[in-house]
Amino acid sequence: MDRRIYGIETEFGLTHSAPEGPALSADDAARRLFAPVLAWGRASNVFLPNGGRLYLDVGSHPEYATAEAATLHDVVAQDAAGERIVDELRSRLQESLDAEGVRGTVHLFKNNVDSAGNAFGSHENYMIARSTEFSRLLGHLLPFLVTRQILVGAGKVHPSGPPAFGAFAPGDGAASYSFSQRADHIWEGSSSATTRSRPMINTRDEPHADAQHYRRLHVITGDSNMSQTTTALKIGATDLLLRMIEAGQILPDRTLADPASALRQVSHDLTGTARLALADGSSRTALELQHEVLEAVTRFVQRHGAHHDRVPWVLELWERGLRAVAEQNASLVDRELDWAVKKKLLDAYAASHGMDLSHPRLAQLDLAYHDTSPTHGLFHMLERRGAVESFVSPQDVSRAVGQAPETRARLRGRFVAAAHAADVNHTVDWVHLKLNGPHSQRISMCKDPFATTQPDVEEMIRDLAAGAV
């Protein structure tokens, strides 16, 4: 495809910590967090003027889904904007509790596992051509997804070692560090379920666009990333592989014998050299599989050209990330890739305090890395110190908080803003815009995710502004 729509859905962890008194339950904290959302949108599931969706997911997890983005720059900016929007709700709740004299601190975490072992996700969405043979795409994509965590994993401390396969309890071995948070909680390669079986790819066919032309690839195996550059590499590298598959490029069959088991193997092997069993009886390492894809993608780009100006950046960081693992030199990427940024921070703290990874303080710092608070979060502390790289500017993120990208999201965002300004009841989803007037209803279907204008929607927006609804 010459153009693609991207989106990221992020579930956040929420907790109220009150060492000197009773803490709010998860349900109470979530209910109070979303009180301003309910007041604004009359529901806890709303679309915002920037085109994104904000809602409470299963288990009292705040979730933000970015607006449809058509560029790597925009999807990274929208993801960062979502974190800022949800953290603003956290800040408002903290102020409210402080004013009421309720002791304690509200924490919002952009991570994937809580202290009880419950997992929550970060889902990536890629629009693909309906004509793409889906089974072929899955065959090439799964080995890539299993092994890309050596680049884009968020990193995780295991104070008592890795958990046993299929177990929620901590391990009973030596303390260790893994590439991925999510890997220990994925059970199969692909499925139409997301919560029961936790697959790597959700195969339920919900395109949120013209189903004759498009399909939505829903990837749910990735970690939530604090680093913008890690997010950009995650989306950018996956997009390049998809382009190559869609173009009919012939790739070797690297079907894994057991993708879920391989996912764990890769996560807990920081050398990238564990042998992964393939379905044909042979084996490959994560480094070998990633190098194979990178080399094929590089040749593809050389033949067909780069489809956006950040492709060289993606390829360079991809290669450097693999070199960092191969050479066991995380300093090559400890400003750009989450697992390496976090590891550098933890290693320095442990060395200066005479600790190892089994110490509870290291697990606390692991969690604090993902705290979204600009003042308390460790990643944001590194950001303020200039210790990590960015992919978009703070101004880009601020703009994305209130403004939709140049896609269908721009139409939706303008419609939502106009309906709220006119105080007119309305219903919105990814495709439909509906005015629920006192005497009549008007509905528009926006099936083209790239369209920034549509006559019937423009008419509704004009009528809302004129008070003619």
Curated annotation (Swiss-Prot):
It is an enzyme of class 6 (ligase). Mg(2+) binds at residues 9, 55, 63. One of its GO terms (biological process) is protein pupylation. It comes from the Bacteria. Keywords: ATP-binding, Ligase, Magnesium, Metal-binding, Nucleotide-binding, Ubl conjugation pathway. InterPro entries: Pup_ligase, Pup_ligase/deamidase. The active site is at 57 (proton acceptor). Pathway: Protein degradation; proteasomal Pup-dependent pathway; Protein modification; protein pupylation. It holds the Pfam family Pup_ligase. GO terms for molecular function: ATP binding; ligase activity, forming carbon-nitrogen bonds; magnesium ion binding; ubiquitin-like protein transferase activity. Its EC number is 6.3.1.19. ATP binds at residues 53, 66, 430. It catalyses: ATP + [prokaryotic ubiquitin-like protein]-L-glutamate + [protein]-L-lysine = ADP + phosphate + N(6)-([prokaryotic ubiquitin-like protein]-gamma-L-glutamyl)-[protein]-L-lysine. The reaction mechanism probably proceeds via the activation of Pup by phosphorylation of its C-terminal glutamate, which is then subject to nucleophilic attack by the substrate lysine, resulting in an isopeptide bond and the release of phosphate as a good leaving group. Belongs to the Pup ligase/Pup deamidase family. Pup-conjugating enzyme subfamily. Catalyzes the covalent attachment of the prokaryotic ubiquitin-like protein modifier Pup to the proteasomal substrate proteins, thereby targeting them for proteasomal degradation. This tagging system is termed pupylation. The ligation reaction involves the side-chain carboxylate of the C-terminal glutamate of Pup and the side-chain amino group of a substrate lysine. This is Pup--protein ligase. The lineage of its organism: Bacteria, Bacillati, Actinomycetota, Actinomycetes, Micrococcales. The gene is pafA.
